[in-house]
Amino acid sequence: MTQPLRIIFAGTPDFAARHLQALIQSEHQIVGVYSQPDRPAGRGKKLKASEVKELALEHNLPVFQPQSLKTEDALNELTRLNADIMIVVAYGLILPKAILDAPRLGCLNVHGSILPRWRGAAPIQRAIWAGDEQTGVTIMQMNEGLDTGDMLHISRCPISATETSASLYTKLADLGPGALIDTINNLANGKITPEPQNDAAANYAKKLSKDEANIDWSMSAAQIERNIRAFNPWPVCFTQMGGQPVKIYQAHVVEQSSSQPDNNGRVLSSDKNGVIVGCGEHALCITQLQPQGKKPMAINDFLNGRSDWVTPGTILGENNE
């Protein structure tokens, strides 16, 4: 029998809500839920609650939405909850040392990588971007550094050759809650030995940008193909076709014996099987894309109306009308 813990949960998006759901179903007591303030959303810009707040209210849990945790009032409010531990999952606010030290057992974080690899903001996307063959979820004890705390639990999962950030996000969102509950139970029973991270092996997962999604055809076809998967569903890779940015959703590498620099971005062929484009190394076959104002479509549907955009010899990435 695990000794039930008094838990504060802090998180904001769906990924966090799945972990909160697991805690609600556990034998532990949730004494407070922290989430980002409601934000304007949709065309009407009406205030929208986070997925975590909505779930907490469904279960009549007390919700707190401070703009910052750095004030004395925020610290006093949290301290009054008399929590044993605080669980932080994709919360979005910085936790100062006073907050980290407030719960009896400190604060735990669920991070979407096998630490110390991919510390930082975009671990799921960067694992695909780099061509990693596996990733996972690390439960760690938080300190003042950026994802530098001692590791308490690691669960691993493979990254498939067709993995997108959306599909990997779902895998880790399924993997994390069970890992979190196991960790909390073992911590409550004194069965965990924290493992320090090897800082020398660490690297950082910087945020994605729309600029980075603009395809650089001088890159290898393999890197571009990984970018397409890593940047799906956001910001989505794109290139200029017919004078407008066109999003690329699916493609695969076509090996070539040699690559010519003047073929970077050049359409080598186009038919119902795909548009083959020269790259810095090998070539890329585009099979699904999305012109402005349209839904994503198979290449055959695209060619029915826009074949003139990808005639052989055309250079993609240039503003050719």
Curated annotation (Swiss-Prot):
<dbReference type="InterPro" id="IPR011034">
    <property type="entry name" value="Formyl_transferase-like_C_sf"/>
</dbReference>
<dbReference type="Pfam" id="PF02911">
    <property type="entry name" value="Formyl_trans_C"/>
</dbReference>
<protein>
    <recommendedName>
        <fullName>Methionyl-tRNA formyltransferase</fullName>
        <ecNumber>2.1.2.9</ecNumber>
    </recommendedName>
</protein>
<comment type="similarity">
    <text>Belongs to the Fmt family.</text>
</comment>
<keyword id="KW-0808">Transferase</keyword>
<dbReference type="InterPro" id="IPR005793">
    <property type="entry name" value="Formyl_trans_C"/>
</dbReference>
<dbReference type="InterPro" id="IPR036477">
    <property type="entry name" value="Formyl_transf_N_sf"/>
</dbReference>
<dbReference type="Pfam" id="PF00551">
    <property type="entry name" value="Formyl_trans_N"/>
</dbReference>
<dbReference type="InterPro" id="IPR041711">
    <property type="entry name" value="Met-tRNA-FMT_N"/>
</dbReference>
<keyword id="KW-0648">Protein biosynthesis</keyword>
<dbReference type="InterPro" id="IPR002376">
    <property type="entry name" value="Formyl_transf_N"/>
</dbReference>
<dbReference type="InterPro" id="IPR037022">
    <property type="entry name" value="Formyl_trans_C_sf"/>
</dbReference>
<comment type="function">
    <text>Attaches a formyl group to the free amino group of methionyl-tRNA(fMet). The formyl group appears to play a dual role in the initiator identity of N-formylmethionyl-tRNA by promoting its recognition by IF2 and preventing the misappropriation of this tRNA by the elongation apparatus.</text>
</comment>
<dbReference type="InterPro" id="IPR005794">
    <property type="entry name" value="Fmt"/>
</dbReference>
<dbReference type="InterPro" id="IPR001555">
    <property type="entry name" value="GART_AS"/>
</dbReference>
<feature type="binding site">
    <location>
        <begin position="113"/>
        <end position="116"/>
    </location>
    <ligand>
        <name>(6S)-5,6,7,8-tetrahydrofolate</name>
    </ligand>
</feature>
<dbReference type="InterPro" id="IPR044135">
    <property type="entry name" value="Met-tRNA-FMT_C"/>
</dbReference>
<dbReference type="GO" id="GO:0004479">
    <property type="term" value="F:methionyl-tRNA formyltransferase activity"/>
</dbReference>
<dbReference type="GO" id="GO:0005829">
    <property type="term" value="C:cytosol"/>
</dbReference>
